[in-house]
Amino acid sequence: MTALPAASITSSALDDLDALNAQLEGLRADERVAWALQHGPQDAALSSSFGAQSAVTLHLLSQQRPDIPVILIDTGYLFPETYRFADALTERLKLNLKVYRPLVSRAWMEARHGRLWEQGMVGIDQYNNLRKVEPMRRALDELNVGTWFTGLRRSQSGGRAQTPIVQKRGERYKISPIADWTDRDVWQYLQAHELPYHPLWEQGYVSIGDFHTTRRWEPGMREEDTRFFGLKRECGIHEDI
């Protein structure tokens, strides 16, 4: 195994995240996870959308820390297949699933604001703040998460092209151990460990969120075009938190 960086992630010596990322780029994904679990702030968690390729990070993290909290934000608008996929992976991998939901029900939100996702960028941003960003921020705070693992990858969209392996947001460290993986890397990992894609993958869904703002991929489209009517890729979680 490649030697892991010895310094603690919380030490003043690692205020230079560029140098730290340069070290981590040379490690395998499992080594990055091992390093972050050993040297990062004690309370770690993984967030997962249980989307198209989510089984990779769920397996990667649960193999090294079986009881790591796995945060799922249930917006109330997920595909039925996503709920069933979450159930199946939770059972198979024995996940410590922590489901967080918005403070306001979908019916009450629609009574107050209408169908926000149909109200342009302003409505989409308000929707994302209510249904996704606020619950995620609450989850991270209530679980006192100091080391936050994600499945972000640079190849997923232009906006993620510069995703570092480790970044600092306030006092929290955000770790993306497969940031440099390609779709082929993901496929190879899933095949090697006999893990499934999301059930909708075979129907042409390459990025899966809420049912009303997700569409099938078609020739000529970028992956990011399949979300939010092509207006944007990010829901705000990885921009605002």
Curated annotation (Swiss-Prot):
Alphabetical list of InterPro entries matching this protein: PAPS/APS_Rdtase, PAPS_reduct_dom, PAPS_reductase_CysH, Rossmann-like_a/b/a_fold
SUPFAM superfamilies from the UniProt entry: Adenine nucleotide alpha hydrolases-like
Pfam families documented for this protein: PAPS_reduct (PF01507)
Listed GO MF terms: phosphoadenylyl-sulfate reductase (thioredoxin) activity
Keywords recorded for this protein, A-Z: Cytoplasm, Oxidoreductase
Pathway: Sulfur metabolism; hydrogen sulfide biosynthesis; sulfite from sulfate: step 3/3
Root EC class: oxidoreductase
Catalytic activity, as annotated: [thioredoxin]-disulfide + sulfite + adenosine 3',5'-bisphosphate + 2 H(+) = [thioredoxin]-dithiol + 3'-phosphoadenylyl sulfate
Entry GO terms, CC: cytoplasm
Keyword Cytoplasm: yes
Positions of the catalytic residues: 235 (nucleophile)
UniProt record, GO biological process: hydrogen sulfide biosynthetic process; sulfate assimilation, phosphoadenylyl sulfate reduction by phosphoadenylyl-sulfate reductase (thioredoxin)
Localization, UniProt: Cytoplasm
Organism superkingdom: Bacteria
Known EC number: 1.8.4.8
Keyword Metal-binding included in the entry's annotation: no
Family per similarity comment: Belongs to the PAPS reductase family. CysH subfamily.
Purpose: Catalyzes the formation of sulfite from phosphoadenosine 5'-phosphosulfate (PAPS) using thioredoxin as an electron donor.
Protein's UniProt name: Phosphoadenosine 5'-phosphosulfate reductase
Species name: Xanthomonas oryzae pv. oryzae (strain PXO99A)
